């Protein structure tokens, strides 16, 4: 079973990009420059009066720097390598109708050539203030969960992803978490390698795996009924994303270490009846302001940030480590 799931891990890492929101990771391939076609010079007019040069359409080939897709590339990786968001790269390449379908050999515009601004004015232009630098990073953390003690043949593989924007001080500007959870029942008959029916795998090879992330599942994920907060998975994750804005990754790590229990959950100050004796001993050391903060936090979210289900803190650290400036 472990060998089979090892294969699943390899497949799933390729498809885990479905969990990625609007930012991207770092690629190591290089780009090539394609020059725009030079317009032909207009014919000399017969008349002695000056004549306007004819208009030449060069819109079919956009001037700028192009990247040539190689096997294994993803659109978000190409965007990240060149300091772009997925949306920005898509706007540069309107000919690409589906960013999830790119092919080896395809050329993608990654930097448009800036037209020289002609000016006859002798006045001095105002100098615009320097733009604040932003950095983007993407992180993944995969973990295999042995669930045998709870349910036979129901182990699972979880791939946690995070896309983040950081300012030049390292503070989080935007943050999006998600998880792809891969269960055995997504592979009918996978426990029997000799099974005659291999149609699932054949279809997958032709059409891909139609997996949904936890956010894509939305309310169908079904956490709301059992959550002490009465909130669905995506609602709680949205809360964490907003709460961590303005903090550095180091500050998030410190917050997690101090205010979360052994299961990676914030101490449930909003639900004191849920606190264990160990929890009560710990929160007794907090100030009133800290206790109030935890009431506010656990009103919005109580699910774990780091446990066998998912590794949000690990993924966030990786995103920061590979951050690249957005240009």
Curated annotation (Swiss-Prot):
Induction (record text): By 2,4,6-trichlorophenol.
CDD domains from the UniProt entry: LysM
GO terms (BP aspect): anaerobic phenol-containing compound catabolic process
SUPFAM superfamilies linked: LysM domain
Protein name listed in UniProt: Chlorophenol reductase
GO molecular function: cobalamin binding; ortho-trichlorophenol reductive dehalogenase activity
Occurrences of domain LysM (ranges): 65-110
Pfam family membership, one: LysM
GO cellular component entries: extracellular region; Gram-positive-bacterium-type cell wall; plasma membrane
Cited SMART domains: LysM
